[in-house]
Amino acid sequence: MTERIPIKNYQRTNAKALLKLTEKLFNKNFFDLYLTSQQLVVLEYLLSISSEEDKLKAWDYFLKGNIALNVEKSFPLTQEEEHHGAVSPAVDTRSDDVSSQTIKDNNNTNTNTSISNENHVENEIEDKGDNAIANEDNFVNNDESDNVEEDLFKLDLEDLKQQISGTRFIGNLSLKIRYVLWQCAIDYIYCDRNEFGDENDTEYTLLDVEEKEEEEIGKNEKPQNKEGISKFAEDEDYDDEDENYDEDSTDVKNVDDPPKNLDSISSSNIEIDDERRLVLNISISKETLSKLKTNNVEEIMGNWNKIYHSFEYDKETMIKRLKLEESDKMIEKGKKKRSRSDLEAATDEQDRENTNDEPDTNQKLPTPEGSTFSDTGNKRPKQSNLDLTVNLGIENLSLKHLLSSIQQKKSQLGISDYELKHLIMDVRKNRSKWTSDERIGQEELYEACEKVVLELRNYTEHSTPFLNKVSKREAPNYHQIIKKSMDLNTVLKKLKSFQYDSKQEFVDDIMLIWKNCLTYNSDPSHFLRGHAIAMQKKSLQLIRMIPNITIRNRADLEKEIEDMEKDKDYELDEEEEVAGSGRKGLNMGAHMLAKENGKVSEKDSSKTVKDEAPTNDDKLTSVIPEGEKEKDKTASSTVTVHENVNKNEIKENGKNEEQDMVEESSKTEDSSKDADAAKKDTEDGLQDKTAENKEAGENNEEEEDDDDEDEDEDMVDSQSYLLEKDDDRDDLEISVWKTVTAKVRAEICLKRTEYFKNGKLNSDSEAFLKNPQRMKRFDQLFLEYKEQKALESYRQKIEQNSIMKNGFGTVLKQEDDDQLQFHNDHSLNGNEAFEKQPNDIELDDTRFLQEYDISNAIPDIVYEGVNTKTLDKMEDASVDRMLQNGINKQSRFLANKDLGLTPKMNQNITLIQQIRHICHKISLIRMLQSPLSAQNSRSNPNAFLNNHIYNYTIIDDSLDIDPVSQLPTHDYKNNRELIWKFMHKNISKVAMANGFETAHPSAINMLTEIAGDYLSNLIKTLKLHHETNSLNRGTNVEMLQTTLLENGINRPDDLFSYVESEFGKKTKKLQDIKQKLESFLRALLRPTLQELSERNFEDESQSFFTGDFASELTGEDFFGFRELGLEKEFGVLSSSVPLQLLTTQFQTVDGETKVQAKKIQPEESDSIVYKKITKGMLDAGSFWNTLLPLLQKDYERSKAYIAKQSKSSANDKTSMTSTEDNSFALLEEDQFVSKKTATKARLPPTGKISTTYKKKPIASAFILPEEDLENDVKADPTTTVNAKVGAENDGDSSLFLRTPQPLDPLDMDDAFDDTNMGSNSSFSLSLPRLNQ
């Protein structure tokens, strides 16, 4: 293939072949990776010439660089011009010429008008978000917005004309086109190819087609075109290979298709000037701006390995970075700037202080990608996709020391930058430094404004001239032309002193910077105008991200809410009165005003403050500068007062600011107590402050003028480097690369300057060490970057989907629509600006610097090895041949699977698995015996089965670990990973044989490493003895014994004893354990019939009703269902007995406790009262005949017990007769008092009976009084003290001291009371208690 493409075709320029090749590449958007948007427009214009001869002629001049562009601007006609043009068409043509000339002469006027209108219309556009704006205002806003867009359109056209006019631009484009075409040929010729065909098949097809076409055409042409034919065919061929560079292109056009969306250019636009140069007349219009598109930076990065970086650009970049850091230091510390020479000689310690004092950005913001214009057919510039490298943000300033430590030791971390970024983002601050409880909306507004200012300041390619105020030395008449000067540092100072109360005030100051530059530098070719236009477009991109918020004072807002509530209450009362009178409600003017103010309170907040202090309006007008009088009419007078106060307090270290905040808070509290008094205090305070501000403002202006004069002395040469020409402006790859790597190149250059001191090498400087993780090939680093980018985009997509599921998407979309209402006609999706997260993947600049490519200066090796893709194709071919031939030979790794100790170890593992399985069955039966598990299994049987399935592991040694190792392309003997896999498998089997059911992978890996080290030591020791040069060299047996001894094995008998115990005795022991467990399991599952009882069947079982228990256990048809044919009808015998029925409560303690638990509890039986059985009921035969003998026996027992208890009593006859009475009730079981039998004497452990008894202490003894109890009983036998009887008689629970009542000693209701006890009974004393 390569031989058919002669390189000699590129030794001459064949314009016709290169033109066709360029058209084909252009149709496939191949040049988007190499050319800027302006260059693409000119190339598209050049390829759209209608005449082929003129096109080829212009192309020939273009390739030789002998061409110039004459650019003219054309504008669309207004409505009035169209109306006049309809009457007289001849005037139409002249109007275009006049308009172009007018714009050429009056460029400054248009520029100034565009910026001023931009500032005014920005307010109107933002106010469109409110729904309460009248229709008349909308018409005015639309007209003014159209005027502003028209002015911006004219400004963009002028800038485009300045860029592409002349010979320099077209010459750079010609050189770039030749470079791209020749580079494609070199890449194709020197691309490695093999027999498996890495290139696309379409290359051969396209080549054959082009060759045939060129051969047919060449028959009628001269032989001199043959080289062009072959060359063109070759060009067409390698072009298809380069299609991979542009993967994002969706449309693939035909080869012969002309460039799209272009009007044909007539030959009258081509002229030859006096210098023999071809002049191409190009007309640019609004449609031309729509063709300017954004480049794909990620694809452009893929070609950065062809950029050779030297330090020639780093000096300017370093100076710009140092100037930015010095500006930050001046803002933070209020010190004067140092001279440029001092900055270049700064020490490392001072650089660190500057870095620490430099405010960081919180969010990565998009920047232009090497192109000034980034809009696609709209007036507004389009947002770019490039993410510049920024720090973690202003939210993480408290982590700056941690971040610096991490950066220093970044090489020691084992995680990627992507993981480190998300790890740090988890600990970021939750509360911003802009948070204020008194000023509502300040945090959101100031955070967004700070991001915009810092991003503009960090855009050092164009922002350096606008960092500080204009020096009086450089522009003496500047302040005579510009009434109000503004710069980025002043904006940042005003932001930090809380002088902005709305977005519009901030936007006005930002846009005023570029307006002043364009107004003062009226020359269209002035270099600062390009910087101003670029910064203006950058500002328009970033301003969209600022929410439209007006800061409100909490006290004022609460007061307005209270007034609104009062008005609502008054309206309700009025409606009630009107409804009572039968009339319709009247529209009161005062009430309607309050209602309208409530609706648009956020918009017209400043007007409410104006009404509170109307007397200050006249006094404040003299304080407002002239530049501020042109601001929006809705700006309040109080806002101006606060701005002036804060201007005077910038240099006072924040002390007065805190005092003002305290005063404001105190006034807010007073206003909440008394509204009228607070209003007067506020008016007086504002008047006092106004008078003070007049004096302080004059003093501060004098101080600022003195500071400016001092700064001018140090800044004489500060702007000189800005006059340097940018030779890479038309080179897309270089410009984007310089923008992305600006910061890191400046840091590297600063560190390299430390190597030298006083013109000599500095031996004390620290070496600039490279990051080992970044010292990879460019392709690997770029692939890692793309993977991290894809992961980040996927993570954001998942988060966005989760937000939409939670219902927050509607709110976010509504907010975006309100803030981007004036960008509805923009082709860019409005949500992109707000979907930017601060934790996006950051671009590491160092990976794209060739200093990290250690092999960039070393020539490549001739043989680079086998490519991975090629190896895969070779293996695929080998596998296909094996499948076709049916070769299925056994792997060489499975030759010893049935030899050695492998079968014995597998047998032990199998026995252990079987024992575990039996134990699992036993534990499952035990678990089913508990009622709780039975209920769970019935409620969810599937989950119960899934959770208690035993996972049986089967060892299959016939499986090959690495079947691919059989291929001839694999070196299995020296494959470390394959050897590790086999060792890992053997160690796992050893662990299983020793009882480990499961193990953590890290533990097995550790054992594998230990085993590998041990075997390696054995081999090393044996190799050392075997290769020794000693004269006392032993035999092979002696060397083996010595090797084992040195590695911990005393003698070979230890190995034999290990094998005998591990694979002999252990196997027998495992078999014995298995047999015993199997017999125990059979005993559990097959209980004897003699052990069956009613306790074995639960209440929910139907075995007694169906006879199923007999048929399952003995095979007997107990009820004869099988003979009657009712087995299928009832379905009681077809199903097996549940396992719960057979296994629950068979001679287990759990079963007994379960039966006891089903007894009637005491609390259940206490409320039940049973009627006592009397003798009369027994005689009458009121009971079941079966129970009568038992009751008669109980009666005799009760009779004997009563007689025995009453023997010692004086009235024996009475007791005997009472038992014969029909009302005598049988005694209950608990009424029989059983005598305790004397316990046998227990012998101590010594076996001897001890005669010494332990005496009880006298303090715990109770001594009875010496009284004659028998005399007391005889004296008053019918009297006793019984609290219980007294309580029962009175029916009251409380006890009182009463007269004792006579009781029947033989009363069976209280037969065993203390009064019925005889002399043999124990003594008891029951005394009444007095009620407290």
Swiss-Prot record:
- Which keywords describe this protein according to UniProt? Activator, Bromodomain, Nucleus, Phosphoprotein, Transcription, Transcription regulation
Q: Which SUPFAM superfamilies match?
A: Bromodomain
Where can this protein be found?
A: Nucleus
- What superkingdom does the record give? Eukaryota
InterPro entries with a match to the protein in the record: Bromodomain (IPR001487), Bromodomain-like_sf (IPR036427), Bromodomain_CS (IPR018359), Histone-fold (IPR009072), Spt7 (IPR037782)
List every position bearing Phosphothreonine.
78
- Tell me if Transcription regulation is a UniProt keyword of this record: yes
Q: Where is the signal peptide?
A: none
What positions are modified (Phosphoserine)? 88, 1293
Give GO cellular component annotations, separated by semicolons.
mitochondrion; nucleus; SAGA complex; SLIK (SAGA-like) complex
One Gene Ontology molecular-function label? structural molecule activity
Q: Which residues form the Bromo domain?
A: 440-546
Specify where the region named Disordered lies, as residue ranges.
80-118, 209-268, 331-384, 566-724, 1286-1332
- Which residue pairs form cystines in this protein? none
Composition skew (Acidic residues), residue ranges: 234-249, 345-360, 566-578, 698-716
Q: Does the keyword Flavoprotein apply?
A: no
GO biological process terms held by the UniProt record? chromatin organization; conjugation with cellular fusion; protein-containing complex assembly; regulation of transcription by RNA polymerase II
Q: List, as start-end ranges, the regions of compositional bias called Basic and acidic residues.
A: 217-233, 250-260, 593-634, 644-697
A Pfam family reported for this protein in Swiss-Prot or TrEMBL:
Bromodomain
Q: Where is the composition biased (Low complexity)?
A: 106-118
Q: Other remarks on record?
A: Present with 2360 molecules/cell in log phase SD medium.
Q: What does this protein do?
A: Component of the transcription coactivator SAGA complex. SAGA acts as a general cofactor required for essentially all RNA polymerase II transcription. At the promoters, SAGA is required for transcription pre-initiation complex (PIC) recruitment. It influences RNA polymerase II transcriptional activity through different activities such as TBP interaction (via core/TAF module) and promoter selectivity, interaction with transcription activators (via Tra1/SPT module), and chromatin modification through histone acetylation (via HAT module) and deubiquitination (via DUB module).
Name this protein carries in UniProt? SAGA complex subunit SPT7
Q: Which organism is it from?
A: Saccharomyces cerevisiae (strain ATCC 204508 / S288c)
The gene for this chain is: SPT7
